[in-house]
């Protein structure tokens, strides 16, 4: 589920303290954005759960819950919609003039990792192990793909991102490849970006930004039962 409130986090903590197998995730939009985005973006900021008040306690609580290990994963909730589906909601974010529902969703995939590094590691001082935990190992554990995925060790697939921690750049929709035609992070200045990625030990994205593997390189991944995610504060 997309955890977005302090109250929800407190209930997760209570359930975990009682020994229940309850794991959760949150998303960059709930760590970084507020309901003020509705004034700027209107229907383009219509997501579920909704963005929370700017003067509320939720964002800081989620950051702390993630750093302390109560929130296992940070996921993109990538749900792009074409502009034509969102634009009719400018006057009413719920339905258009004909009563057709305005869809939920916003793009997040292309900004997930840069924002995690820039806002979590570079600005808040969280360790790199936090980023590896919430973006890689814990998701692999939760969805039954660990230890083949999500970890660097003998026998695992060599899925690696070689990261440039010093790169400084500005998020711009014009550089994105998705269908949404916008990003809620337009104009954000961030630090860090992928220099190269490898999938199963082979270069996927090279330093020139070119894909080196062809369609068909992907492989079916059979799932096993979930493995409890890593808990406790990151160090």
Predicted segments with their positions:
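Residue-level signal for inorganic ion chemistry
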Residues: 25, 77, 116, 201
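Short, solvent-exposed cationic patches
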Residues: 219-235
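Short glycine/proline- and charge-enriched loop/turn segments
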Residues: 38-47, 87-100, 177-180
